[in-house]
Curated annotation (Swiss-Prot):
Its EC number is 2.7.1.40. Keywords: ATP-binding, Chloroplast, Glycolysis, Kinase, Magnesium, Metal-binding, Nucleotide-binding, Plastid, Pyruvate, Transferase. Pfam families: PK, PK_C. It comes from Ricinus communis. Coiled coil: none annotated. This is Pyruvate kinase isozyme G, chloroplastic. Gene3D superfamilies: Phosphoenolpyruvate-binding domains (3.20.20.60), PK beta-barrel domain-like (2.40.33.10), Pyruvate kinase, C-terminal domain (3.40.1380.20). K(+) binds at D14, T15. InterPro entries: Pyr_Knase (IPR001697), Pyrv/PenolPyrv_kinase-like_dom (IPR015813), Pyrv_kinase-like_dom_sf (IPR040442), Pyrv_Knase-like_insert_dom_sf (IPR011037), Pyrv_Knase_AS (IPR018209), Pyrv_Knase_brl (IPR015793), Pyrv_Knase_C (IPR015795), Pyrv_Knase_C_sf (IPR036918). The keyword Transferase applies. GO terms for cellular component: chloroplast. GO terms for molecular function: ATP binding; kinase activity; magnesium ion binding; potassium ion binding; pyruvate kinase activity. ATP binds at R21.
Length: 418
């Protein structure tokens, strides 16, 4: 179904990761000051005691720890523990539902980042040719290298997005993002494991790091949380989307709003509308941001100057790419208009949909440059994405040109004619 519409919709498989969850409970209402006890004994479900799915849970917590339930919706203070039970007092109460996520503030569970279940899901992704993996609770770069080695052995061309949601990941941010193909700011668990006032600063930092390495970055969790139950968002949620867009996120993501919310389509429309409006109101700088990690690279120089030209002349950019690299470089500089990225590789088309400002389009390339240019312009005219008489900036750069064997680089401006 993802490929049934003219829009390019990529598929990302989100691994479950090493989550610690409570078992099934009779939905008790936890009240401040009452005793409540997680236990590693299986099948326990009473008003004051519930099983957890992690055998080392008792060993991981110490007296004085704060347990956060369901992303911090409720909290428990650890008072004492036995060999199989943690005795707690409720600090912030609420209704406890079955299979809620448990975090220890400031700590991560000593579990492998990729569980046995995750490996099964990853194999499913290989068999079904998903476009991205989102790997949960990544603590260091080792797990990214491990997954990439597995994908290499499987001959699977799938990119790895790391979810930054663990306290242990923060000291290793640079190496984790460097090893990955992109990052997701998963603010729910990040705000549970770290003080919540740190989350906006970390969001900005992660976006900045990804930009410097020319990796895509997604901002996720609680963006339109109120729309799970209500048809309109809070004004703070609207501002949250706008801030993520202004900070330079490549994508913003919904989860509970569309997974089990009452208004999934409305939530998507709100997010889409706010993101577009925010982008349209952003000031256009003729000179793009400073060059990034590959500033000595010929391709980066061309992307930089193509962006200056497009912004100065107020034109969209058309790029022809086999590998996607030039489209990625152009996206890094965030030109004011759309980047139409033509590629003759389906996998590249799917991958480029994640990058900010890029509209990927599949098209077979001709060995003749003029024929290729003309076909691309006609296709955009037919789709209503260009109008006759406007100008476009054409970019072709790289060691794998689209119409001959030797390396070629050029930028040109053309007037669209039918």
């Amino acid at each position: 179904n993802a490929q049934s519409h003219d829009n390019v919709v990529s598929i990302m498989l989100d691994t479950k990761g090493p989550e610690v969850r409570s078992g099934d409970v009779p939905q008790p209402m936890l009240k401040e000051g009452q005793e409540f006890n997680p236990t590693i004994r299986r099948g326990v479900s009473t008003q004051d005691t519930v099983s957890v799915n992690y055998d080392d849970f008792v060993n991981d917590v110490v007296v004085g720890d704060i347990l956060l339930v369901d992303g911090g919706m409720m909290s428990l203070a650890v008072k004492s523990k036995t060999s199989d039970l943690v005795k707690c007092v409720v600090v912030d109460g609420g209704e406890l539902k079955s299979r809620r996520h448990l975090n220890v503030r400031g700590k991560s569970a000593r579990l492998p980042s990729i569980t046995d279940k995750d490996w099964g899901d990853i194999k499913f992704g290989v068999d079904n040719q998903v476009d991205f993996y989102a790997v949960s609770f990544v603590k260091d770069a080792k797990v990214v290298h491990e997954l990439k080695e597995y994908l290499k052995r499987c001959n699977a061309d799938i990119h790895v997005i790391v979810k930054i949601e663990s306290a242990d990941s923060i000291p290793n941010l640079h190496s984790i993002i460097s090893a990955s193909d992109g990052a997701m700011v998963a603010r729910g668990d990040l705000g549970a494991e770290l003080p919540i006032e740190e989350v906006p600063l970390l969001q900005e930092d992660i976006i900045r790091r990804c930009h410097s390495m020319q990796k895509p970055v997604i901002v996720a969790t609680n963006m339109l949380e109120s729309m799970i139950n209500h048809p309109t968002p809070t004004r703070a949620e609207v501002s949250d989307i706008a801030i993520a867009v202004r900070e330079g996120a490549d994508a913003v993501m919904l989860s509970g709003e569309t997974a089990h919310g009452k208004y999934p389509l409305k939530a998507v429309r709100v997010m889409h509308t706010v993101a577009l409006r925010t982008e349209s109101s952003s000031p256009v700088n003729t000179t793009p941001p400073a060059q990034g990690a590959y500033k000595g690279h010929m391709g980066e120089m061309f992307a930089f100057h193509a962006t200056i030209m497009a912004n100065t002349l107020n034109t969209p950019i058309i790029v022809f790419t086999r590998t996607g690299s030039m489209a990625v470089l152009l996206s890094h500089y965030q030109p004011a208009s759309t980047i139409f990225a033509f590629t003759n590789e389906e996998r590249i088309k799917q991958r480029l949909s994640l990058y900010r400002g890029v509209m990927p389009i599949y098209m077979e390339f001709s060995s003749d440059a003029e024929e290729t240019f003309s076909r691309a312009l006609q296709l955009l005219l037919n789709k209503g994405l260009l109008v006759e008489g406007e100008h476009v900036t054409l970019v072709q750069s790289g060691a794998q040109p689209i119409w001959r064997q030797e390396s070629t680089h050029h930028i040109q401006v053309r007037k669209v004619q039918n």
